[in-house]
Amino acid sequence: MKFTRMLVLASTSLLATVATSQAQEVKRDTKKQGEVVLKPITIISHGKDNIEATGGTVLTYKDIEKLQPANVSELFSRQSSIAVSGGGGPSKRIHVLGMEQSNLAVSVDGVPQTATSWHHTGSNVIDPAFLKRVEVEAGAAAADSGFGAAAGAIRYETVNALDLLEPGKTFGARIIGSYGTNGRGFSGSTAAYGLKDGFDWLLMLHGTSGHNYKNGDGTEILGTEPAARNILGKAGYEFDGNRIDIGYERSRDKADRLIKMNMGLPGDTEYPLEVARDSVNIKYTRTDATDMWDPEVQFYYNRNDYWRNDYQNRTNGNMILKEDLYGGKLQNTFTIDYGKITAGIDFGKHDYNTDNYGHNDRRYRKFNTQQVGAFTQGRFEFDNGFSLSTGARYDYSRFADWNDEVFSDSGASVNGTLSYKFNEHIEVFAGASRTWLGYVLGDYGYVHARNNAFYTDPTFSPGRARNYKAGVNFGGADWSAGITLFDTRIAGLPNYDSQKLGNDPEEYRSRGFTLNARYIWNYTTIGATFTKAKVTAGDDPVLPNSGSFMPIGDMATLFIDQEIPDYNMKVGATLAWAGRISDEAATAANFYDQPAYTVVNAYAEWNPPAVKNMTLRVGVENLFNENYYERTSFAPSQNRGGIDAVWAPGRTFTFQTAFKF
């Protein structure tokens, strides 16, 4: 679609008469412990989108504290729309509605992240120990969510000193130590933070050391030992209405892993592997922002490395991947009578380097992509009960391949979400987007196994996506529920065949619906989610081969949290269920049916009255020792002499002690 037509569509949506809606937010009254007060939230509230009201997921700091996740599987264990495949930390892949997170605009503290480099590596980009908030905006994403938001956006936000300091204090520290059975081993997290004369700072360290775990049948799963060594550092300074934030994150995972971490091959062995990530960013904002001047300026640098050196087998071979991503964003938010408008530009350059296996006649390859974009997003609440979030962006994309061939193009994207509130208990909404993705390189790890003749098809073109969603939310004084229908289509993705890089001819699609419900009564919270999704490539179901699109079928979660204030205790449990998947396409490709499974996790937490700054916790994952592999894992098949899944851990107990000073 031409840019002028897209601009007309965006302008039309900005002028449309549309509806506002409400969801329910839980807010604890500090005057009476345990009393719950619910206040309405519209889809647009104070110029911000309410992600949950349109079928998305939000994990707050309190949610993360309840879960105390050791990995991203546990982080998203209560979300049926998000599936995480199993294995060691670097192998975990996150899929939203069956679409791997590389299809979403992923950021950490506002910094764009690199896509998954290889279909046998994981997609997690952040240590859960550092997190304070996660937003998963599934489907139509806002224009200021970033470039390439084909299927939505995932925003991870890490803690800072102001989040952890006790009221009235200028220095604090936190120490968390745990021991887990079934190979989990020891985990330790230490943080120090302070505030003085407008300067705040934080330093946090987290490390794990364990062994390979066993599945529910007692079989050792190779390459799964915990081996994280991570650092988070932050500093902020406020002066004369200005604020500058600087952040650094470093992650290392060095251990013996399977050659292809997400699948078990016949006679498979472990081999030394190191995965590393470094990220630096600096951001400028105003603490005394006005209606017309509320700027945000950010610059960043990311580096991702994958080292598998000197492997002797030519079929798999050496594999060294290096990525450098750097860029920035400049934007301003304008406040008007009915809401806010954010406008700005963003830009980035992504450098790729591959070291092919030793017998290849093209040992090294270097290539890069560049992007520059302009965007605007408006979020409005009207007095008549209507609300609207709509925006557009225009991007230029350039791709220079390993043969110095250059491809360039530009395109526009547009989005809109509207809602209407019938009364204080019912809301309806609908949203849509068309997104221009630029040149998508995706699973570029294939390049490491291509010879000197490998080239880019001269007709290689940018990708594109369409999203549609609609739903209804219900709410009362102590309960809420909702349903969201979704339909996402992505085309123009890359295809690395044996001779060239070209476009995949298939259109990939995920469609279905999600349900959610929550009930709150005094100290008790009960919640449930259900997701049904059909994921296809063209007219056929996608195969369970750990690709960018995976079948998830039917999935559900049920959870409960209970506070027991008389004993300073909290207890809770989560049940996750996945239905059986069987289809003719997978059978024809020699995959076995994927069995159903049900997994229960539980925890208990106690604050001893005599030591108020100490918390003791015991958790159990997979309480009933179910033998299963997580949905979106590489499914077992008869191919290559028999491929096995990387099975999930069996019953695992974790004992944790935390001190806060």
From Swiss-Prot:
Its main location: membrane. Residues 170-661 form the TBDR beta-barrel domain. Induction: Induced in absence of iron. It is found in: Cell outer membrane. Residues 1-23 form the signal peptide. It is a multi-pass membrane protein. The keyword Signal applies. GO terms for molecular function: siderophore uptake transmembrane transporter activity. Keywords: Cell outer membrane, Membrane, Receptor, Signal, TonB box, Transmembrane, Transmembrane beta strand, Transport. The keyword Membrane applies. Pfam families: Plug (PF07715), TonB_dep_Rec_b-barrel (PF00593). InterPro entries: Plug_dom, Plug_dom_sf, TonB-dep_rcpt-like, TonB-dep_rcpt_b-brl, TonB_rcpt_b-brl_sf. It comes from the Bacteria. Residues 48-159 form the TBDR plug domain. SUPFAM superfamilies: Porins (SSF56935). Heme transporter. This is Heme transporter BhuA. It comes from Brucella melitensis biotype 1 (strain ATCC 23456 / CCUG 17765 / NCTC 10094 / 16M).
